[in-house]
Amino acid sequence: MQSIVPYHTYEYGDQPEVIATVPGRFHLLGEHLWFAQGDALSVAIDKTLQLSVSRRPDNNFRVYSVSLDDRRRISSTNMRYRKEDRWVNSVKIVIASFFDHGISVSGLNFTVLSEIPSDASLGTPNALKVATGLVLRQLFAPNLTLLELADIIEYANIQGLTSYGHRADIYTALFAKAGTCIRTEYKKKTVIHCAFPPEGYSIILTDSKIPRSIAREELGLALRDCIDAYEFVKKLPDAPKNMHNLTEAFLQESDIPEAVKRRVTYVIRESAAIDTAIKALESGDNQSFVRLIARSQEGLRDRFEISAPELDWLVKRTNELAKNEPDSFVCARLTGKGFGGCTYSILKDEQIPLFTDKMADYERFFGLLPQQYTVKSADGAVVQVLQ
């Protein structure tokens, strides 16, 4: 990735003091379980966002996005979320969260340079929030632990955006290691690393290019239905106090709507899949891992109902490449919010051209031109101090 320093210097006339480089990410399993405090299995990718910063003589903030060619000014007296501020809200809410935690922050010049594909559910807003937190920590709160910083960023999401994204977004950006996937243990606030993918396999991310404007409202309604179903079961008189002990047998024996059973069954199965997936990866049990991914995709399509024909098509084309190979690690699933965004495909290196060739059919069927990225698992965020 090109250096951010010349852009910052040209824009503000001074050298940056601190640069944070944060990876994008995708989720293998579990990203939709945040409301159930479930774990997630994720991968940081070698597409990054850089954020540089230098001090100002006042208490205001300027933010320049190289990628968007957009410049914004932020007043220290107005840190509330505003829809019209769009991407810069990610910076504002983290600064506000530092204020709310009693940490003084003086005026700064920010420059943003990102190579993470936008609008593809690969973590661009999350990377900007984490990068903002890291540079503020370096300048104003160096004694903060990374776990404490993660809490501040999560607070920013909840208070600033009224958003409850999975804690795994933040933990993956901070704690990932190259050559591994990372399990975020939601309740414990800990992580586990596991080698991923196996040797000889590559990760292909395919952006479906489904317009977000079309999907956003439908996605919101679907997620609301899933959360309501879980809360409905949680309030049943004989529901277990610890919902992690909830079983499919309990659902089948309960007099509850079928739609509720269907959605909560997905939560139970996806939660269990995280444990099984780690064991499969550690033991080299490719078949078990591939079955888990296929079952998760089926659940997102049929139980959570947040897939789309375009995503299903991409998954199916991947799985076709694994036919007659019983020990293959080839698998695919949607990743992120759903109703659009990306799928990930784990393919043998020699299968990549075969998969890429199928994209002409995708364009013909759906009238959309997909974008593909071959990525590698990457390390978590890095902070560089220049002055």
Language model: regions and residue ranges:
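Short beta-strand->loop micro-motif that forms the acidic, two-metal-ion catalytic signature
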Residues: G340-I346
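Gly/Ser-rich oxyanion-binding loop with an adjacent helix/lid
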Residues: M1-A20, H32-D39, E84-P197, K358, ...
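Short catalytic helix/loop segments, enriched in acidic residues and glycine
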Residues: A44-Q50
